[in-house]
Structures are given as C-alpha cells and as structure tokens.
Amino acid sequence: MESNRQIKKQVVAGFVIFRRTEDGVKYLLLYRRGQYWNFPKGHFELGEASLDTALRETKEETGIGKEDLRIISDFRAYEKFSFDRGNERIFDTVILYLAETKKVQVTIVPREHSGYAWFLYHDALKVVGKQYAGTKRVLRLANEFIKGKQRRPAGPPQAQHAHPTKHPSQQAERRHEPHPGQRPAHPKRP
C-alpha cells in the first residue's frame, strides 16, 4: 500500500574526477554492482562537512586521496533524484565537486563496485544512460566548465559585466567558501 510507504531524505557528496590525456579529458566512472555507472560518492558521517565527505568517500571507493587531487574550488553541482527501496521512498540530494588527478590506477571496493573506467566525455554520456539524466547534466556542466577554463587567456580575467569600474571578483556572488587550506578563487585585495 502506498500509505505505508516511508519517506527518507538523504544527502550524499562526491567528486567528478577527471584527468588530461593525449586523447583528451577523461572522466572517472565507477560501475555500481553491475547496474549503472556513476561518480564516487557517499553518505555523510556525523559532523562532517560535504567536501570532507566527498574526499573520504572518494578515498574509500577509489583509493584516490586528497593528495592525488587538484580540487577546482569554484565548481559545485547538485543532482536530485528519488528511488524506491523496500517500503521506503528515498529522496537523494548529491553534492558533487570537481577535481583533476594524474593518478590512473583506481582501487575499487568489490562490495560496492564491480568496475571502473576512464571515459572521454561523449563515451561517458553514453554509458551513463538515458535514465540518469541528473548524472548526465552534472557531467555536461563539468565538461563545459573545464573547456571554459582551457580557453581562458593567460593573465587577469577579461571583464564582461554591467559595471566596468568593478573588478569581476567584486561582482561575483560566492556560492561557497573554500575548504580550509585552499585559496579562494578570487582573493580579496587590500
């Protein structure tokens, strides 16, 4: 019966991890128990911040640690979806960060994943599949973000905004503060 169904909300965090190769940018996807491809991610532990959760889960699921990642501090994406598990309806919110790595070898946990692969963007979209539109959307956002960063000329960013007398960093609204130890994307000037 629908009335006996329990509703559960959960928040998880993870990473869209990429590396640059001679063939182009490749994205890491994990094969979840022979069912679908997705990013490394997992549940929060008590008192844990979302970035700390993403780092811990990525290390647990892939063997890729913080020391192997160059975290892109000005990117964060969200994915929302729901699914049924037993008599529960689960509503998931996924917080995804973006990070680059040079590490190729991944160590998966067999109880959670049955495989992994590094995919070029268009191949990643294909293996994710039509039913995972949120994952594909995040992958698109990450790919566009990376491509935009590659095209940016060296030197200070070109101002294209409504108030030409203000520096772009004074206009941009920060969506999140950097993790302790990370420099802000646009440091404040004295």
Question: Where are the regions a protein language model picked out?
Answer:
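Nudix hydrolase/Nudix homology domain
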Residues: G34-W37, V106-P190
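Active-site segment of metal-dependent pyrophosphate-handling enzymes
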Residues: I64-Q105
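Short secondary-structure boundary/capping segments
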Residues: I7, L29, E88-R89, T107-V109
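Conserved Nudix-box catalytic region and its N-terminal flanking loop in Nudix hydrolases
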Residues: D23-K66
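Short, well-ordered beta-strand micro-motif
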Residues: I17-R19, L96-E100, L120
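Conserved N-terminal beta-strand and adjoining loop/helix that marks the start
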Residues: E2-Y27
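Short helix-loop capping/hinge motifs at secondary-structure junctions, enriched
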Residues: D23, V104-T107
